[in-house]
């Protein structure tokens, strides 16, 4: 498989004291993010793709357990920038006042044009295999998505589903469903790497 020696840096959003958003039944976004990220890490390894996890457990990201005066996001970005030939895939969940909203959506950095292709590959595979009725489109990030806005490497943020939608939360709480999501994200990544336009 052609990977161009790229390293996929997997960011499980939030962690530790930062739970992210949550569902009506109290399920924390940080836990769903980590579970999907760990599945993604396993699938990428099976495919022979170099990858790293920013966090592997329920913690904030402070390298070497120190320098807590700096924000978690600054540290994550510094870590990504320290990896040669990195491609950032950040895993998150969405939330909205309308509990009927559902489905994956992927944000991408404007700083590296090929990021849009990566985002499109991920969403298209998810629509094909899991969410055929999903009508969402991917979006270019603005400054409210700091890690994407400041990214200097190909970067996407995968909003896997809505924590405000009870049915989608039920899906996201399922280990089998999370593995299916991780599989379609993996397919999108492998297509992107094989296209070699980064």
Language-model features: where?
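Extracellular cell-wall/glycan-interacting regions and their flexible linkers
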Residues: 1-8, 16, 21-25, 42, ...
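Catalytic-core regions of hydrolytic enzymes
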Residues: 1-118
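Glycine-rich, flexible loop/turn motifs
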Residues: 18, 69, 102, 134, ...
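Short, low-complexity, polar/charged sequence segments that are solvent-exposed and flexible
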Residues: 29-31, 107-111, 124-128, 175-179
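Charged/polar, solvent-exposed surface patches and flexible loops
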Residues: 75, 124, 170
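Active-site-adjacent mobile loop/cap segments within catalytic or ligand-binding domains
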Residues: 78, 83, 90, 97, ...
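Active-site-adjacent substrate-binding region
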Residues: 114-141
